[in-house]
């Protein structure tokens, strides 16, 4: 039985990288897939590719920093497919700056793209969602570990993890589950160019791939897993559990 056939899934930042893999995975399950992205060229290309096999995908150009465009995204998605069953808040940017050079404008660009968009997309989608729907947010292991110059990014991802359990509480009465995924190193570029040392620093002995996150989304969105809500699942090949000492 295909539990996703005919379900409507919105994937923000769905035109490339992890988001593209998520969109493709749900399309293979015969879901109605809405690709929301600021990149019109890549978005339309993916829409065309997915619709070569079945007419169930729709690209909607969306700047997730813009509240009006988010409202239009949700409205158009509902008008096109008559329901919103799954929302995957994947859109995000990872711009790192020196702590002392980080301006308010730089800070707000990252926070508004990564964190505020999760709130706005979820608020608007939840208004139209029915019992049994779900929201999946993409955080990061950088919410709990850091490098220099990642203040805005880490704050945004930490906020996503926190707002996940807050929304899980607020939306429980509507029967909407809310969960979070924290990816580690997910290579969206040239996987073959990675070094052995890159793979060996993971317990899994390999760097992650976009499909690892897509499969986690399928798991969390599956109706049989309706006892899971308010959770943040780390998918990082065990990297954040590895104890490291200087040698």
Give each language-model segment a name.
Residues 127, 169-173, 226:
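Alpha-helical segment proximal to the catalytic Tyr-Lys
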Residues 122, 156, 164:
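Active-site helix of classical SDR
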Residues 180, 196-228, 235-237:
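C-terminal helical subdomain
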């Amino acid at each position: 039985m295909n539990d996703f056939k005919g379900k409507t899934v919105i994937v923000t930042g769905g035109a490339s990288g992890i988001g593209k893999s998520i969109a493709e995975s749900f399309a293979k399950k015969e879901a109605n897939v809405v690709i929301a992205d600021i990149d019109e060229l890549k978005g339309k290309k993916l829409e065309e590719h997915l619709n070569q096999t079945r007419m169930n995908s729709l690209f909607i150009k969306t700047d997730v920093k813009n509240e009006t465009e988010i409202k239009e995204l949700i409205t158009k998605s509902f008008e096109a497919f008559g329901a919103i069953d799954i929302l995957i808040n994947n859109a995000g940017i990872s711009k790192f700056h020196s702590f002392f050079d980080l301006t308010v404008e730089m800070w707000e660009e990252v926070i508004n793209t990564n964190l505020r968009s999760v709130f706005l997309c979820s608020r608007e989608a939840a208004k139209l969602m029915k019992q049994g729907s779900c929201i999946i947010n993409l955080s990061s292991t950088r919410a709990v570990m850091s490098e220099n110059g990642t203040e805005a990014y880490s704050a945004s991802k930490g906020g996503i993890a926190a707002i996940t359990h807050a929304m899980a509480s607020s939306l429980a009465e509507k029967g909407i589950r809310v969960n979070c995924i924290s990816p580690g190193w997910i290579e969206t570029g040239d996987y073959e160019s990675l070094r052995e040392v890159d793979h060996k620093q993971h317990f899994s002995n390999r760097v992650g791939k976009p499909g690892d996150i897509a499969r986690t989304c399928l798991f969390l969105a599956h109706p049989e897993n309706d006892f899971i809500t308010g959770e943040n699942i780390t998918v990082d090949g065990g990297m954040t559990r590895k104890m490291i000492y200087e040698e």
